[in-house]
Amino acid sequence: MGGSREEDRQHHNHLPSELPLGFRSSSPTTMIASSSMSKESSNYDMADFDQASLFLYLDSHDQQSIQEQRQTLNIFPSQPMHVADPAHEAKSAGVAMAMLPNGNQLQVLPSHPSKKPDQQGGQKINSSVPTNPPGPNLPLPNSAKDNKNSSLIKKEGSSSGKGATTSNDPEREGRRTLDPKTLRRLAQNREAARKSRLRKKAYIQQLESSRIRLSQLEQQVHVARVQGAMLGAGDQHQGLPSGPSAASLFDLEYGRWVEEHSKLIFQLRAALNEQMADSQLQVFVNGAMAQHDELLSLKGAIARADIFHLLCGVWATPAERCFLWLGGFRPSEAIKVMLKQVEPLSEGQLMSIYELQQAAKGTEDALSHAMDGLQQSLSDTVAAPDVAAAGGFMGHMSLAMNKISAMEDIVRQADGLRQQTLHKLQHMLTIRQAARCFVAISDYFHRLRALSTLWVARPRPEEGPAM
């Protein structure tokens, strides 16, 4: 009996070397787990089992009995629990055991998952194995690697998930735009932005109108100061006007006015080209009208100080001087200039403008006739034969000065006619037509000044030899 047990034990020790080739080619991880499990299994005491069960277990590993006996459940394995029975491995052809990462349970993994169940000859394989006996749970050598691999897999999964979300971003955006709450919020944002733009536009218009009003007030203050200086200069020297002082002040102020008016007309032309609203154009039109009123005030001051300086037109360019009428432009000529730029006009506007032009023409003729009569009377007074007498000189000079004062009245009437004509044109025309009217009149005088500059700067022919 002892000899048979010894032979069985030797036969049991040689069993691992007789494993088939498919099982020997298992992964190193499985071999390491096998060694660890074999070490743990060696800690068990064989005395815990009865002899009959032990003999039955040893007899079951006989080669002939394995081939003859029907395959049954292996309750007491002599090999490590993760190693399958060689006979069972040969019959199942491709079933491998793998240890889970925690080292507590085993799982059966078929090596050929594509094989159908009916081709396995009705063999039944246990999908679970009893857990390890109580004892110290030693970590496997490759558990750290498995944990690292699992963490890498999790990271890859998370990264792939992020990629999926980014690829689905357009779809999500489409769903968001269809959300009623989002649409309502976007509509509210657009409405708030529109109101903000309107407030900003109104604020800019208010600033622009305030700036123009401030400039007008500054001009009025400056004109009043100049008028006071001119009147003070005219009262010097026993009531005789001091011409050079008042004339120089007027020339400086007229040059400044031309510069300011050119800037305003440039802005008005830009507003017309940009198709601005009528409210904005109204500000520029009112500014242009205010500047013309300022110029007429300056002319009234210089007329009281030095009427001859205003009538001779030294303050104007040579080309402007040729078209001066009583110290300024003819209102009828200004209407003719602006009619070519303000078209189209309605029939009512044409009739009103035609009547205004005829009335201005009649007033011009009357004032021109009055001025001609005053000039002729002044010439006769100065050329009287009794002026050389001792008592007649001062009397004739007093009469001549009265005639000069009448000339001042005629010039003021001419300035009033110019001012009335411009104001009536502004009321007859629409805002855009009035803007074009002021632009046309300004361009007319600007071209006259440019013509004078070109004439003065023309190349002069060389003088011939002296006779």
Swiss-Prot record:
<dbReference type="GO" id="GO:0043565">
    <property type="term" value="F:sequence-specific DNA binding"/>
</dbReference>
<keyword id="KW-0611">Plant defense</keyword>
<feature type="region of interest" description="Disordered">
    <location>
        <begin position="105"/>
        <end position="184"/>
    </location>
</feature>
<feature type="region of interest" description="Disordered">
    <location>
        <begin position="1"/>
        <end position="42"/>
    </location>
</feature>
<feature type="compositionally biased region" description="Low complexity">
    <location>
        <begin position="25"/>
        <end position="41"/>
    </location>
</feature>
<keyword id="KW-0804">Transcription</keyword>
<keyword id="KW-0539">Nucleus</keyword>
<dbReference type="GO" id="GO:0006351">
    <property type="term" value="P:DNA-templated transcription"/>
</dbReference>
<feature type="compositionally biased region" description="Polar residues">
    <location>
        <begin position="120"/>
        <end position="129"/>
    </location>
</feature>
<protein>
    <recommendedName>
        <fullName>Transcription factor TGAL7</fullName>
    </recommendedName>
</protein>
<keyword id="KW-0238">DNA-binding</keyword>
<dbReference type="GO" id="GO:0003700">
    <property type="term" value="F:DNA-binding transcription factor activity"/>
</dbReference>
<dbReference type="Pfam" id="PF14144">
    <property type="entry name" value="DOG1"/>
</dbReference>
<comment type="function">
    <text>Transcriptional regulator involved in defense response.</text>
</comment>
<feature type="compositionally biased region" description="Basic and acidic residues">
    <location>
        <begin position="145"/>
        <end position="157"/>
    </location>
</feature>
<feature type="domain" description="DOG1">
    <location>
        <begin position="247"/>
        <end position="458"/>
    </location>
</feature>
<feature type="region of interest" description="Leucine-zipper">
    <location>
        <begin position="207"/>
        <end position="221"/>
    </location>
</feature>
<dbReference type="GO" id="GO:0006952">
    <property type="term" value="P:defense response"/>
</dbReference>
<dbReference type="InterPro" id="IPR046347">
    <property type="entry name" value="bZIP_sf"/>
</dbReference>
<feature type="compositionally biased region" description="Basic and acidic residues">
    <location>
        <begin position="1"/>
        <end position="10"/>
    </location>
</feature>
<feature type="region of interest" description="Basic motif">
    <location>
        <begin position="181"/>
        <end position="201"/>
    </location>
</feature>
<keyword id="KW-0805">Transcription regulation</keyword>
<comment type="similarity">
    <text>Belongs to the bZIP family.</text>
</comment>
<feature type="domain" description="bZIP">
    <location>
        <begin position="179"/>
        <end position="223"/>
    </location>
</feature>
<dbReference type="InterPro" id="IPR004827">
    <property type="entry name" value="bZIP"/>
</dbReference>
<dbReference type="InterPro" id="IPR025422">
    <property type="entry name" value="TGA_domain"/>
</dbReference>
<dbReference type="Pfam" id="PF00170">
    <property type="entry name" value="bZIP_1"/>
</dbReference>
<feature type="compositionally biased region" description="Polar residues">
    <location>
        <begin position="158"/>
        <end position="168"/>
    </location>
</feature>
<feature type="compositionally biased region" description="Basic and acidic residues">
    <location>
        <begin position="169"/>
        <end position="182"/>
    </location>
</feature>
<dbReference type="GO" id="GO:0005634">
    <property type="term" value="C:nucleus"/>
</dbReference>
<comment type="subunit">
    <text>Interacts with NPR5/NH4, NH5.1 and NH5.2.</text>
</comment>
